[in-house]
């Protein structure tokens, strides 16, 4: 029981920190926690720490920032590919990225 509570506290703190400081998406956070052998149910509990509106706001901010960096890229296909890959690498879900890029 006590160990579970300590792990839960760790997971919540980890999720908050990685999202707020490093701007990681759920997929990247989940992979990092799985590498630490954290159970799936604890990971789901940890994701409660991420506000959905804030999550989408961060995704849009990263999208706009990367778009600015890629201004000089003339090939629109390459630009979209680089944008998508960047956001996937940050751990955001493919569906959300796809919706944002439409």
Where are the regions a protein language model picked out?
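An alpha-helical, amphipathic repeat domain used for nucleic-acid recognition
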Residues: 1-102
């Amino acid at each position: 029981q006590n160990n579970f509570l300590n792990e839960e506290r760790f997971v919540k703190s980890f999720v908050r920190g990685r999202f707020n400081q490093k701007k990681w998406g759920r997929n990247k956070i989940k992979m990092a926690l799985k590498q630490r052998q954290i159970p799936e149910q604890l990971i789901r509990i940890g994701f409660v720490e991420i506000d959905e509106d804030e999550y989408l706001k961060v995704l849009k901010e990263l999208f706009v920032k990367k778009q600015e960096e890629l201004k000089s890229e003339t090939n629109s296909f390459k630009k979209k590919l680089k944008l998508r890959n960047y956001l996937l690498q940050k751990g955001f879900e493919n569906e959300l990225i796809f919706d944002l890029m439409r």
